[in-house]
């Protein structure tokens, strides 16, 4: 059995923390981080708002990300070995792929591949506070959060909802442990009910 689980949502919402916890707990589990598919900095457009457009779908090489997912679907054993994942012998017929990122549900060719889609949310003020506390390879220029990051999050979330993409909303204000146990239990139930 193969499951593809999406862990999407707002920037600094807890996606990576949740994904890393699930990765350790699930059998034969691999992860693909959307952030690994950013185009080179010199290919990122500057928008009318004056900011580099990092928070738009066009800043990502989604075709390559889709190809990577398709490689896992075709042969999860080979994919796991190539990515240094040790397969558990007792669960050899169970494979889980976690996709983690902020625009997972905006690229139509990926949307229907998910077995389950989660979407982390946090309120504006908390998101802004968390964003300020992080250090990025390309530092945020003044005004980026209010002028670009938050408006793009709102735009893509609205489009996702208008397109009818079904997600399980998760409250990113809950403790990381609480979110982990909620999602792990959900995935384990899905594995039990489909085996």
Swiss-Prot record:
Coiled coil: none
Binding residues for ATP: 9-17, 130, 134-136, 174-176
Tissue specificity as recorded in UniProt: Expressed in skeletal muscle (at protein level).
Domain of life: Eukaryota
UniProt xrefs under SUPFAM superfamilies: P-loop containing nucleoside triphosphate hydrolases
Residues annotated as binding Mg(2+): 16, 35
Pathway: Cofactor biosynthesis; NAD(+) biosynthesis
Active site: 35
GO MF entry, a single one: ATP binding
EC number: 2.7.1.22, 2.7.1.173
Residues annotated to bind substrate: 35-38, 54-55, 131, 136-137
Biological process per Gene Ontology, one example term: NAD biosynthetic process via the salvage pathway
Signals that turn on the gene: Down-regulated during myoblast differentiation.
Gene3D superfamilies found in the cross-reference section: P-loop containing nucleotide triphosphate hydrolases (3.40.50.300)
UniProt record similarity statement: Belongs to the uridine kinase family. NRK subfamily.
Subunit structure of this chain's protein: Monomer. Interacts with ITGB1 alone or when associated with alpha-7, but not with alpha-5.
Known role: Catalyzes the phosphorylation of nicotinamide riboside (NR) and nicotinic acid riboside (NaR) to form nicotinamide mononucleotide (NMN) and nicotinic acid mononucleotide (NaMN). Reduces laminin matrix deposition and cell adhesion to laminin, but not to fibronectin. Involved in the regulation of PXN at the protein level and of PXN tyrosine phosphorylation. May play a role in the regulation of terminal myogenesis.
Protein name as it appears in the record: Nicotinamide riboside kinase 2
Species of the source: Mus musculus
